[in-house]
Regions:
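RNA/tRNA-interacting regions in translation and RNA-turnover enzymes
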Residues: 1-128
Length: 128
């Protein structure tokens, strides 16, 4: 899975993250920190967010802090069966590049890991 994610980054020129989908609790929200929120980062790191930092959260915890890293809870492990690849972009980056990177990651994993792609979607601010 990590190779699929790195391959997508190299081919599309965007950052792609991967998480264990089954460990996500409820709906996902892309949010901006008020400052002081905490996250249990991968490998035992502890993040204290600054005001304005971009984060992805489920209904219980922060899953990823942009430019700091992902959480331990949803880390891909040997027993992971369902993954979510995701990416962020700043205004001015066309969604086609995100879709290209996510497609490379999903197709690579499906081909070499024997998985199935459920969907590839790009959400733009204000579209939902």
């Amino acid at each position: 899975m990590v190779d699929a994610h790195f391959m997508a980054e190299m081919c599309a020129g965007i950052l792609v993250a991967v998480t264990d989908y089954d460990r996500i609790e409820g709906m996902l929200t892309l949010d901006v920190a008020h400052g002081g929120e905490t996250s249990a980062g991968m490998g035992g790191r502890h993040f204290v967010l600054k005001e304005g930092e971009i984060m992805l959260r489920d209904e219980k915890d922060i899953i990823c802090v942009l430019c700091q890293g992902a959480d331990e809870k949803t880390k891909v492990k040997d027993d992971t069966r369902n993954v979510l690849f995701y990416s962020y972009a700043v205004p001015g980056i066309d969604g086609i590049y995100l879709k290209e990177g996510l497609t490379v990651a999903a197709e690579t994993l499906a081909q070499f890991g024997g998985g199935t792609i459920r969907c590839i979607e790009v959400f733009v601010k204000g579209s939902r």
